[in-house]
């Protein structure tokens, strides 16, 4: 029996290795320093932060942890001259800001060669607002496949709004549309293939599946919600769920993680765990003053 189990594990390990070798880096991660393993302390590509406020209160969110600890970045541009890509934004919900259209236009003029990415929970995106925005990539967060589960995770009854946002961006083929999903085993692992199927049916181009980072202030909330902390750190579990979602959509996992996994052999992939705990999230890029005046 022991030999049979070992053979089965080796077969699964080889399948995981093949899957990893074939995976592409998320479109959003392209140009990020994390893809270059020769960089000792890589940072995320630049972002423009509009507000740390959010109309969701997600049980896993790093942004609300930063707010509680007084470490959320102040509004402004965090990056450098000649960026390849800029995200609006990494903290808070950018569509809450009345300056979203103004800043979007300013960044397009100020950095005409840069790719502009919008990261949003989608709940405030309407057809009217969408017509005023100009982005190359839109990432919409969705971590549940039902209204009830979505409300439990986000503490907001906005599931239908988020689905509508996916429909809006999925229909616009001038942008790369991405559903951004956090892997929370015990909470949403069964939802992830359903999210992938739903997003694909709405014309969304890609799923960016990310491993959970457990921030200390969120531990109790995640525990009450049913998180399996051990499985949350298992690369094997993450990859198995990604393989299931791949049946429906172009699924990709975090680029800085993927480049490391591609260097591992099959059995290492099968057995490795990722330490997923962190006390406080920090922006590692310096704030740079740029003008935001409209012509």
Regions found by a protein language model. Give the residues of each.
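Alpha-helix N-cap and loop-to-helix initiation/capping positions
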Residues: 153-160, 187, 223-234
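Core AdoMet radical
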Residues: 45, 62-73, 80-97, 103, ...
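N-terminal [4Fe-4S]-dependent radical SAM core
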Residues: 1-54, 59, 63-69, 259, ...
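Alpha-helix-loop-beta-strand connector modules within alpha/beta enzyme cores
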Residues: 100-111, 163-172, 229-253
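Conserved strand-turn element in the central/C-terminal portion of the radical SAM core barrel
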Residues: 166-191, 195, 211-214
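Auxiliary Fe-S-binding modules of radical SAM enzymes
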Residues: 1-8, 193-194, 198-295
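Distinct, well-ordered alpha-helical segments
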Residues: 100-102, 126-133, 191-195
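Acidic (Asp/Glu)-rich catalytic clusters
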Residues: 78-81, 130-134, 167-172, 200-201
């Amino acid at each position: 029996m022991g030999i049979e189990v070992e053979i089965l594990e080796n077969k699964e390990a080889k399948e995981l290795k093949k899957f990893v070798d074939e995976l592409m880096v998320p479109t959003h991660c392209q140009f990020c320093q994390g893809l270059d393993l020769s960089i000792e302390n890589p940072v995320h590509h630049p972002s423009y932060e509009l507000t740390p406020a959010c109309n969701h209160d997600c049980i896993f969110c790093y942004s609300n942890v930063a707010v509680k600890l007084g470490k959320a970045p102040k509004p402004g541009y965090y990056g450098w001259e000649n960026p390849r890509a800029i995200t609006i934004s990494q903290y808070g919900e950018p569509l809450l800001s009345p300056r979203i259209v103004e800043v979007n236009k300013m960044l397009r003029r100020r950095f005409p060669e840069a790719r502009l990415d919008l990261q949003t929970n989608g709940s405030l995106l309407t057809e009217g607002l969408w017509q005023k925005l100009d982005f190359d990539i839109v990432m919409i967060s969705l971590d549940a496949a039902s209204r009830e589960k979505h409300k439990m995770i986000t503490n907001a009854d906005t599931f239908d709004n988020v689905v509508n946002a996916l429909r809006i961006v999925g229909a616009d083929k001038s942008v790369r549309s991405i559903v951004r999903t956090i892997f929370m085993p015990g909470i949403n692992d069964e939802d992830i293939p359903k999210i992938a199927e739903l997003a694909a049916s709405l014309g969304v181009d890609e799923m960016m599946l990310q491993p959970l980072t457990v921030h200390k202030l969120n531990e109790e909330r995640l525990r009450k919600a049913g998180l399996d902390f051990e499985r949350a750190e298992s690369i094997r579990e993450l990859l198995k769920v990604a393989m299931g979602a791949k049946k429906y959509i172009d699924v990709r996992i975090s680029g800085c993680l993927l480049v490391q996994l591609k260097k591992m052999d099959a059995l290492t992939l099968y057995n490795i765990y990722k330490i997923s705990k962190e006390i406080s999230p920090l922006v590692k890029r310096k704030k740079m003053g740029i003008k935001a005046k409209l012509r």
